[in-house]
A protein has these predicted regions:
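Acidic, Ala/Val/Gly-enriched low-complexity intrinsically disordered segments
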Residues: 2-4, 13-15
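Positively charged n-region of N-terminal signal peptides that target proteins for export
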Residues: 21-28
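Bacterial N-terminal signal peptides
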Residues: 31-40
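Boundary at the C-terminal end of the N-terminal hydrophobic targeting segment
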Residues: 42-44
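Non-catalytic cap/lid and distal C-terminal segments of serine-dependent acyl enzymes
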Residues: 46-53, 59-95, 99-416
Length: 416
């Protein structure tokens, strides 16, 4: 698709204010058009074999070829260069040595991993370095990491669809948390063209270390929903992704000062609090979500204001928030999806939720996730109560590859 159109449609906030002087402009655009013409006419392999008249060939990285992928980095003065990738058995320490080649371009070819979205980086003389040839990156907290997208059935909904929804960043005022706070909101294709149509809403919550952009960056929410809706596999819906850090107004990349955090494990301080203060400390964000964000969305977007048209899902910390929201406000959401959840509920709370009526309770976790036992315990608790639910156990751990899979799965079950 047209990359310029993609950037305008997906993001309006990350723009570079670069001024190019007039006498440079002509040469800049001539060079740019030449590069685009060459790149547009050739694939990576053809470009690598192109005769550049004695000049150095451009460095292509990563380069997928049938059943392998090659990574390259030009590093003239390096002595040791390694590759680290999330497909490795130990991605937080495992590395592969790269070999120095012609013109000090370091290279390594590996078997093509299974279809999925991976992140990677180079380690140059002990220092982590991103791939300067790869413009496709994900932001995970404060880190930007290059992406490797391996095509296949698993990733077919992670790329761009033909018809695109819109991602915006409205702000709402929170009286409970004492600040204006930023949201990420996805509206489906056709939302602007059909001003009388109303939509159901999925409230999608991130985990610890994330923010309101985590699900669109690491989770590929816009791409997954675009594809599912275009294929008729999911109902057109609005997706609201709040910032789950109660002391933050927005993602740290915006540079907005944060409030000092009150530690939940400071027992002496908690003992001196009133009941209302303790509740605000423990449940302030969840109460803001249910009593401030939901009304804000239903006032400012064309959202259907009914429990049957509201869903809530979240990963890890956000899974805990999902469980808390569902038991504190049992009549608010008819679709509840805790994913790798760091949270729990009492049998009494779950019984009240069951009585209120739930159309779908979708519980998911990886079988090597450090929170897997919690998921097992919740599954057993729901069974003991005769609480109808779906329990999805996947391979793998506490990772985005699982959370993308869960979103791709449960989104097809909502609002039907």
């Amino acid at each position: 698709m047209d990359e310029a159109r993609y950037l305008c449609n997906r993001s309006t906030e990350h723009e570079n204010g670069i001024i190019i002087k007039p006498f440079i402009m002509k040469h800049f655009f001539t060079s740019a058009l030449l590069c685009l013409s060459i790149a547009g006419a050739m694939n990576a392999q053809e470009l690598a074999n192109f005769n550049f008249g004695g000049r150095q060939k451009p460095v292509i990285s990563p380069e997928i070829q049938n059943d392998s992928v090659t990574f390259r980095l030009k590093a003239d003065y390096a002595t040791v260069v390694k590759l680290s990738g999330s497909w490795m058995p130990n991605p937080w320490g495992g590395t592969i040595d790269m070999q120095r080649g012609e013109n000090n371009v370091w290279e390594v070819k590996i078997p093509l991993p299974e279809p999925e979205i991976y992140t990677y980086n180079f380690v140059v003389d002990g220092v982590a370095v991103n791939d300067p040839q790869n413009v496709y990156v994900q932001r995970d907290g404060t880190r930007y990491l290059p992406m490797l997208i391996v095509p296949g059935e698993r990733t077919e909904n992670y790329g761009e669809a033909t018809k695109h929804g819109t991602v915006s960043h409205p702000w709402y005022h929170s009286e409970l948390l004492g600040m204006d706070r930023r949201l990420t909101v996805y509206t489906p294709y056709g939302y602007e063209a059909n001003p009388k149509k109303k939509y159901p809403v999925l409230y999608l919550l991130h985990g610890a270390g994330g923010d309101e952009e985590a699900w669109t960056s690491m989770g590929r929410t816009a791409q997954i929903l675009d594809n599912l809706i275009e294929k008729g596999l999911a109902e057109p819906m609005i997706v609201v992704m709040p910032n789950g850090n109660a002391n933050q107004a927005a993602a740290r990349t915006l540079g907005i000062p944060e409030k000092p955090m009150q530690m939940r494990w400071d027992r002496d301080a908690i003992a001196k609090m009133s009941e209302a203060e303790r509740d605000l400390l423990m449940n302030g964000y969840v109460r803001s979500l249910c009593t401030e964000i939901v009304p804000f969305i239903e006032k400012n977007f064309r959202a259907i204001p009914k429990p049957a048209s509201r869903a809530i899902a979240g990963l890890s910390m956000g899974g805990g928030h999902t469980i808390s929201a569902s038991v504190l406000y049992p009549e608010l959401f008819d679709y509840i999806c805790p994913l790798s959840a760091a949270g729990d509920a009492t049998p009494e709370q779950l019984a009240a939720l069951k009585k209120a009526g739930v159309k779908l309770y979708f519980l998911a976790c990886g079988n090597t996730d450090f929170l897997f036992q919690r998921a097992e315990d919740m599954h057993a608790k729901l069974n003991e109560l005769g609480f109808p639910h779906e329990y999805f156990v996947s391979d793998g751990g506490h990772v985005w590859s699982n959370w993308r899979l869960y979103l791709n799965t449960f989104a097809q079950k909502l609002f039907k």
